[in-house]
Amino acid sequence: MSINEVFRSFKAQPVNQLAKIQAERPIWFVMVGAAIFLILSAIFYFQLFLAMAPCEKCVYIRFSQSCIVIAGLIILINPRNNILKTLGLLLAWYAMIQGWIWSFELMKIHDAAHMVVDESMDFFAAAGDAAGSACSTEPRFPLGLPLDKWLPFEFAPTGGCGEDDWALFGLNMAHYCMIAYATFMVCLAPLTLGWFASFMTDRRNTIVYQTR
């Protein structure tokens, strides 16, 4: 099937095409790969190469990205299994929404810290006080998971929120995290719709078959 034929069939029956896409593994490999890329970028580029110590919100964001990976792996076991798909989608939506919230909170802290810096002659004292007052070195992960003890290099906060000055095209790390989560959600929404449509169709077919 050519690309033009794919687009024509998608235009004619978008929900059916989404149902087919979400029932196969490739799209979920993409989701897992994207989340792994974000995690590895944070660890190897920002933490190791740029020597930027992760803050409390940063490790929470890593946790949410790890949840996206786990959600994708659950679905990849069998994308056609409704129980696995439900568990995976619930975890993925939780991780994306919560990750966006943590990123938004980090952005607000970053803005507040740098606002204090702009009004102070002492950059390090002002940024440290503003960021440190909003962050903790003892994170509280969901379900009480001691990830900072199990994997301290990845999940133990050693920096203050908002202390970094990294920016690209005028946007800081928190902004890009918000964009990443928003992109995840925009992509997951039609896949969720496709799965739900497929689930309801299968259910109706089962009911019709049982009533014959």
UniProtKB/Swiss-Prot annotation:
UniProt topology in membrane: Multi-pass membrane protein
Protein name: Putative protein-disulfide oxidoreductase DsbI
Major localization class: membrane
Species for this entry: Shewanella oneidensis (strain ATCC 700550 / JCM 31522 / CIP 106686 / LMG 19005 / NCIMB 14063 / MR-1)
Function in brief: Required for disulfide bond formation in some proteins. Part of a redox system composed of DsbI and DsbL that mediates formation of an essential disulfide bond in AssT.
Pfam families registered for this protein in UniProt: DsbB
Gene: dsbI
Keywords in alphabetical order: Cell inner membrane, Cell membrane, Disulfide bond, Electron transport, Membrane, Oxidoreductase, Redox-active center, Transmembrane, Transmembrane helix, Transport
GO MF annotation terms: protein-disulfide reductase activity
Coiled-coil blocks: none
